[in-house]
């Protein structure tokens, strides 16, 4: 249920510094019981509604949407994934297109904080992501090592998705797909200038619940 934020993201994506004839904006309204689908349509997105009592969660919704996407008449070179509460830098698609033209097939963008000054919790999250982005992800990319997907701001060559499918459905589907790709000798690369602004938790309890979910997902992948 993302009716409060989805229009802002769709409007943001329509204003990127990229030929709007070369990309489409899809919204997956997964088991929503609010007005997410209607709001997204009114904002200009192509909305696909999914209702299922089995296979709940982001990973299952992505697999479902990819299957529908590949059956469409219009074909796409790549797919980018964003969370509903994100904002995207105007040059995001330009940066990703450059990486794709360079032969990179799975690419993670720079996840920045959308609300670093809201509370001390969101501030700590922002600092931790800034450190990881520079000291971990950028460093690994410069050393020729595979990076890790971050759940949003991800870009995939569609041929990779068609060939291997999307089989990542645990709580941390990003980590799961990163490992699956590495087992096929496909590294995840890093686009330092392809920036996404992600909303961070405001309270300690929100942070606790999110971290607990991530920890469970990482344990499942291991």
Please report, for each region that a protein language model flagged, where it lies by residue.
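The conserved acidic donor/metal-binding loop of glycosyltransferases
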Residues: 83-87, 167, 181
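Short, acidic, metal-binding catalytic loop of nucleotide-sugar glycosyltransferases
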Residues: 11-22
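Active-site beta-to-alpha loop of glycosyltransferases that engages the nucleotide-sugar donor
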Residues: 1-10, 31
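Acidic donor-binding/catalytic loop of UDP-sugar-dependent glycosyltransferases
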Residues: 34-35, 82-99
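Long helical/loop segments within the catalytic core of UDP-sugar-dependent glycosyltransferases
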Residues: 49-74, 91-171, 208, 212-222
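A conserved acidic beta->alpha catalytic loop
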Residues: 29-37, 52-54, 87
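Catalytic donor-sugar/metal-binding loop of nucleotide-sugar-dependent glycosyltransferases
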Residues: 169, 178-196
């Amino acid at each position: 249920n993302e009716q409060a934020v989805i229009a802002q993201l769709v409007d943001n994506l329509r204003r990127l510094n990229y030929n709007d004839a070369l990309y489409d904006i899809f919204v997956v309204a997964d088991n929503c019981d609010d007005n997410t689908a209607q709001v997204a349509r009114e904002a200009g997105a192509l909305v696909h509604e999914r209702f299922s009592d089995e296979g709940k969660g982001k990973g299952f919704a992505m697999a479902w949407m990819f299957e529908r996407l590949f059956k469409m008449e219009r074909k796409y070179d790549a797919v980018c994934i964003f969370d509903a509460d994100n904002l995207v830098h105007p040059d995001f698609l330009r940066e990703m297109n450059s990486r794709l033209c360079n032969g990179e097939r799975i690419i993670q963008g720079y996840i920045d904080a959308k609300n670093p000054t809201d509370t001390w919790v969101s501030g700590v999250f922002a600092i931790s992501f800034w450190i990881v982005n520079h000291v971990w992800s950028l460093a690994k990319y410069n050393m020729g090592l595979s990076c890790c997907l971050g759940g949003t701001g991800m870009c995939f060559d569609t041929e990779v998705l068609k060939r291997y499918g999307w089989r990542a459905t645990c709580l941390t589907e990003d980590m799961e797909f990163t490992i699956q790709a590495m087992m096929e000798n496909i590294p995840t690369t890093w686009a330092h200038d392809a920036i996404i602004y992600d909303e961070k938790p405001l309270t300690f309890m929100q942070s606790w619940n999110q971290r607990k979910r991530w920890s469970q997902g990482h344990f499942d992948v291991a």
